[in-house]
Amino acid sequence: SLCTAVTFWLILKWEENYDQPHSTRWLVLIAYLIGVSVGVHLLNLLCIVAIVLVYYFKTSEKPTVWGSLIAVGISALIIAAILYGIVPGIVKVGGWFELLFVNGMGFSFNTGLIVYIVLLVSAIAWSVYETQNGTREWAINISLLLTIALTGMPFIGHKASGVIFGIIVLALIGAYLFSSSIPEKFKPSKWLLNTIMLCVMTITIGYSSYAVIVIRSTANPPMDQDSPEDIFALGEYLAREQYGDRPLLYGQVYSSEVALEEREDACYPLYNVKGKSYGRKEKTSANEKDSYYVMDEKRSYIYAQNMFFPRMYSPDNRHKSEYNHWVGGIKGRKVPYNSCGQMKTVTVPTQLENLKFFFRYQVGFMYWRYFMWNFAGRQNDLQGHGEIERGNWITGINFIDKMLIGG
């Protein structure tokens, strides 16, 4: 809350001093706070939408609805660049360097990481210098591309697809920057490029606060979840892999069966490999070189029964009971399922039942109830699980409350 409040206060300070020299410093400070807040709570990134809108309305002579929508779209791209680019990208690219120097060249642990940090700092410093004082266009463009690549911004995705996507993005940016056929008025000014690089620098500095996690873990404290002592364990920690995965827009439900494939008279579950988990290999002799080994593959199982916007997905029996309770009895629909030559029937919830759970529990109980506690009123302070007499929200207006929770 503090980071969010201070961040929005700073954009108002920028608006107040918009026409003053060096007003850009407020934007750079905002970028630093956003980088710091990534280590506190990712919700602070939502301030970016409001920040971009304030910037648009202040700098635009005639704001329009379409202009506002474009500003919101730009803010979404900025959030994606930070959340899916810089945050996992720095760790991802650092991991590539670490594997190259340790497994590929035989250096000791952390050598690749140190080389990467030196290169990243040098690239950012070079790009800031070139965009501020440089006169050679090719040097400005190369420093920008190098900084973007080393921060991992374009490498969104897993395995080879993420690398290919990143190379394509870098190629498109390079073609745009180096193109002589694009008029200068459609190219970013040095001031804008310098501001962007300063913001990238301060976001990276703020984000570096996560180094405390590694330092703390190296001391082996009693509470050391996932023990993020190296770049690979830190990546899994930042990705919150300890909390598992869940389908958001499309995926399995609680009764879904894993899809099977018959090979050589046996059935095997189908899955996608999202990546590999690396760990430090224990030495068997003093002369053995440091190296990393693949501990496990990060698998994502493929399910035979899927639906759009699945809300009831947990196979835990306790959760199944709650699903049934909040829906008011799940009848579902029967779906045929070919289990390696044997036809079976799986009962999955209907989309109507799925939406009932969404609106009654996720929206009504877990969001709207808390919202109205703060802005309307609270029935009592008893812990409730959906009962009519425990912990609901009220308005304080008698006839409305009778309709909500009875007399």
Regions found by a protein language model. Give the residues of each.
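Transmembrane-embedded, aromatic-rich helix segments that form part
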Residues: L43-Y55, P88-V91, F165-V169
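Membrane-interfacial interhelical loops
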Residues: S1, Y84-L113, I142-G166, I215-A233, ...
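Lumenal/periplasmic acceptor-binding loop at the mouth of the active site in multi-pass
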Residues: S217-G407
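Transmembrane signal-anchor helices characteristic of membrane glycosylation enzymes that use polyprenol
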Residues: G35, H41, I82-L83, V200-A219
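Membrane-interface transmembrane helices that cradle and orient dolichyl/undecaprenyl
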Residues: T7-W26, L53-T64, A125-T135
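Cytosolic-side transmembrane helix boundary signature
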Residues: L120-A139, A160-C199
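Short hydrophobic alpha-helices at membrane interfaces in multi-pass membrane enzymes
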Residues: N17-G35, T64-L77, R136-T147
